[in-house]
């Protein structure tokens, strides 16, 4: 699935997945044994087809599809598209604020609106009336209503810097200044996004809608039919759609002039189609040195972390089935991210694909070297970036081993930090202490060290995982590691540490503090000693990593300017979770020695259901086990097209030339695995739910005629 993130854990996943994408881990590497790699050349669209609304390729559209959309078309499409919270895409599909996105984008929302005694993931959610539509706390959608180029203003500020370190600071300061100014002037949510690694800067203004209510979500079994084994494959049979509604400030369905009408016939073979959405992140413009670092260090490390987190959450679910809703959401997200990262890694290890990247870099570098002015400004940037990656390779794993974050680090570490802070404050007169460490506030601080829902078993498993990371990247004989774990590893190390610790519960912490601040600072508690003894080293590593990456960011920004000078808008910028338009056609592809047809049907769904013995994850919800009378099994269900998508595109509308809905994108095929760094037109496909299939089942399986009628009419009809 294309969505890698749920709204609660977005920042945490970014931390360790480096914005993973959403493609599978199944092997696909091409054999290069028979090929002379020197003959491998970059493809015309290796950098993809995620076109910005600022720089649409009009001539290309006209020559390829005999279609030259005008400004009104682009504005209507832009205003009809939405960003779904901070992790998916969506769109308005009726004048009454009806919103369409994927079911897997709605998982967290479904969990949130589930009432006691309900199991909406298993049974689905159907709002038969407007009054039945359920508000989702905290959910919002963004509509991009403004964009403009602010490159000159930002670059002028950057150019005033006297060194590479200052460039990043000057860039951030100017962006903050412009965003604040424009936000005050427009009343919109303003965000400035670097494109082409800083070759261009675009300002986007969003209107945010915060009253969003769930209208329809199918059962998990049909939305994610085939489960993890079928994920990121094709043929597929998934009803991966859901519908919400935006309400206005008066609590009425929002009236909007901009929405996508529903196509009467849906997508057809060979038809040009456009995916309108917010692709999250790609690294297609990265240098070869940056990609090699990702291949050799970043992604292998991330996969190890994901594997440990998946194991932990599966064990927690096995131990406590009452936490099924929350833990299954987390496991789903982690496994999706694992497949994504593993898929990118497989691609990076493919010598043919890497040779295509090397050829692109060679051509780009040759173009720069051929222009004396460009060569003088930018000719050394590739070597400088390679040098920075070499330096980063020497310390990043060590920095990672000593780093802390709230998602993957055991709570014990943060408790130790807080106990140390309390002790240091207790040395001071009350009037000089931080407010958190005085009187009743101190009691509150102590009580909050371990929350009522604190899970000690989970923390112990996170501790074991952290010990393994420290041993791997710092070494078992490292003084910090040796002292902390007592020369032990795994569960033995956990037992050793917890037996010696005095901060695993609030009562013991109070007893320790009662001995005085010096007793805390000089304690032999393993957590306290580790936090004190590792502080300077962790800061040293973190500062060095920041220094290297800040300087490299400056190099990448300059390289982005060179890229734009050489190629202009003939190639699109990397994905930035901002609105893009990706063109393609409905088309199958060769696979497994045969050919994947562009469409699947409900006949195929039932063939898969019975062919797999009606067993999970190919079992069906009760209402689907026997097709209802009138359901046309020949109706197209899912389909593939040649559009370019990535994580963040989940929920993107697929439209035709008339800006009508013909589908909703939810996945990519296995050949799209390396899409993070290279787009392959030959077999890369977008997998979508067909518009005809959605309406057919909404009306005939779910008996939700009011929704089916609204999609057909483009407005509420009753």
Each model region followed by its residue ranges:
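Bacterial N-terminal signal peptides
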Residues: 14-24
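Terminal presequence/propeptide segments associated with secretion/organelle targeting
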Residues: 2, 9, 13, 28-718
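Short intrinsically disordered, low-complexity coil segments enriched in acidic
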Residues: 1-3, 22
């Amino acid at each position: 699935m294309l969505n890698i993130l749920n709204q609660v854990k977005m920042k945490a996943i970014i931390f360790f997945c480096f914005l993973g994408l959403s493609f599978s881990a199944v092997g696909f590497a091409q054999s290069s044994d028979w090929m002379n790699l020197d003959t491998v050349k970059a493809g015309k669209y290796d950098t993809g087809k995620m076109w910005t609304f600022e720089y649409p390729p009009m001539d290309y559209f006209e020559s390829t599809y005999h279609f030259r959309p005008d400004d009104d078309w682009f504005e209507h499409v832009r205003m009809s598209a939405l960003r779904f919270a901070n992790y998916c895409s969506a769109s308005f599909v009726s004048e009454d604020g009806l919103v369409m996105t994927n079911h897997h984008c709605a998982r967290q929302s479904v969990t949130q609106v589930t009432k006691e005694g309900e199991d909406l993931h298993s049974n689905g959610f159907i709002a038969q009336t407007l009054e039945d539509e359920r508000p989702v706390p905290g959910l919002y959608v963004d509509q991009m209503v403004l964009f403009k180029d602010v490159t000159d203003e930002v670059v002028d500020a950057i150019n005033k810097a006297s060194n590479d370190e200052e460039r990043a600071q000057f860039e951030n300061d100017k962006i903050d200044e412009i965003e604040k100014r424009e936000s005050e002037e427009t009343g919109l949510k303003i965000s400035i996004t670097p494109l082409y690694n800083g070759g261009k800067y675009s300002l986007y203004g969003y209107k945010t809608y915060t009253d969003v209510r769930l209208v329809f979500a199918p059962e998990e079994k049909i939305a994610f039919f085939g489960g993890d084994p079928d994920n990121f494959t094709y043929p597929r049979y998934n009803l991966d759609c859901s519908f919400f509604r935006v309400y206005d400030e008066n609590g009425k369905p929002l009236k909007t002039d901009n929405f996508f009408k529903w196509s009467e016939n849906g997508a057809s073979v060979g038809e040009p189609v456009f995916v309108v959405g917010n692709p999250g992140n790609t690294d297609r413009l990265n240098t070869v040195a940056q990609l090699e670092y990702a291949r050799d260090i970043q992604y292998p490390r991330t996969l190890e972390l994901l594997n440990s987190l998946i194991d932990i959450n599966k064990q927690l679910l096995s131990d406590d089935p009452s936490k099924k809703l929350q833990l299954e959401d987390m496991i789903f997200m982690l496994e999706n991210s694992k497949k994504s990262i593993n898929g990118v890694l497989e691609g990076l290890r493919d010598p043919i694909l890497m040779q295509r990247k090397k050829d692109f870099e060679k051509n780009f570098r040759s173009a720069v070297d051929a222009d004396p002015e460009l060569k003088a400004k930018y000719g050394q940037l590739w070597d400088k970036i390679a040098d920075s990656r070499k330096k980063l390779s020497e310390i990043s794993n060590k920095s990672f081993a000593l780093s802390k974050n709230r998602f993957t680090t055991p709570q014990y570490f943060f408790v130790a930090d807080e106990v140390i802070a309390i002790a240091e404050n207790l040395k001071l007169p009350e009037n000089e202490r931080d407010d958190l460490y005085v009187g009743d506030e101190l009691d509150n601080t102590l009580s909050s060290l371990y929350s009522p829902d604190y899970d000690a078993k989970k923390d112990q498993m996170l501790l074991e995982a952290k010990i393994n990371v420290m041993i791997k990247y710092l070494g078992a004989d490292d003084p910090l590691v040796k002292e902390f774990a007592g020369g032990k590893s795994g569960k033995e190390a956990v037992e050793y540490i917890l037996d010696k610790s005095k901060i695993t519960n609030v009562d013991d912490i109070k007893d320790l503090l009662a001995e005085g601040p010096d007793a805390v600072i000089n304690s032999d508690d393993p957590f306290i000693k580790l936090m004190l003894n590792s502080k300077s080293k962790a800061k040293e590593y973190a500062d060095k990593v920041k220094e290297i990456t800040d300087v490299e960011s400056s190099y990448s920004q300059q390289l982005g300017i060179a890229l734009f000078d050489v190629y202009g808008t003939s190639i699109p910028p990397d994905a930035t979770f901002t609105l893009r338009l990706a063109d393609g056609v409905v088309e199958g592809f060769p696979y497994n020695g045969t050919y994947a047809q562009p469409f699947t049907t409900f006949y195929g769904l039932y063939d898969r259901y019975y062919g797999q013995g009606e067993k999970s994850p190919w079992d069906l919800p009760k209402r689907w086990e026997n097709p209802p009378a009138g359901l046309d099994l020949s109706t197209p269900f899912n389909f593939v097209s040649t559009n370019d998508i990535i994580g963040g595109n989940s929920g993107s509308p697929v439209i035709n030339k008339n800006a009508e809905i013909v589908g909703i994108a939810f996945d990519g095929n296995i050949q799209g695995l390396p899409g993070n760094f290279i787009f392959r037109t030959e077999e890369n496909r977008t997998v979508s739910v067909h518009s005809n299939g959605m309406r057919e089942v909404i009306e005939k399986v779910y008996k939700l005629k009011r929704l089916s009628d609204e999609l057909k009419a483009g407005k509420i009809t009753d």
